[in-house]
Amino acid sequence: MKFSLVATIVLLALAQGSFAQGAADLESLGQYFEEMKTKLIQDMTEIIRSQDLANQAQAFVEDKKTQLQPLVAQIQEQMKTVATNVEEQIRPLTANVQAHLQPQIDNFQKQMEAIIKKLTDQTMAIEN
């Protein structure tokens, strides 16, 4: 009877030890799953934040674009007015410059024609 009592105690001790080892494994497995859950939550939160940041940036750009459209239209209108004014001021100046240069251009053309005629006449005289 003592032997069976001792064998039972040893068997209980071994069983308790193996249960303790199983509990430790279970605890480490539970900790691993807890860490995985925490990492997954952090990753998903970061993805949602980055998506939210992209949406905020897009909304900001659209808002500023909407605000700037009237200003751009106003600047374009002012540029058209300035271009018209500059053209009106330059047109008489170009006409004036052309009027001053045209006699000189005509004179230059006559001189070049005279030189070419003289060279042609000299070439004809040499050939004969």
Swiss-Prot record:
Taxonomy, superkingdom: Eukaryota
Cellular compartment(s): Secreted
Predominant location: secreted
GO cellular component: extracellular region
Acyltransferase as UniProt keyword: no
Signal peptide region: 1-20
Keywords assigned by UniProt, alphabetized: Antifreeze protein, Pyrrolidone carboxylic acid, Secreted, Signal
Modified positions (Pyrrolidone carboxylic acid) in chain numbering: 21
SUPFAM superfamilies documented for this protein: Apolipoprotein A-I (SSF58113)
Family of this protein: Belongs to the apolipoprotein A1/A4/E family.
Function: Antifreeze proteins lower the blood freezing point.
The name this protein goes by in its record: Type-4 ice-structuring protein LS-12
Organism of provenance: Myoxocephalus octodecemspinosus (Longhorn sculpin)
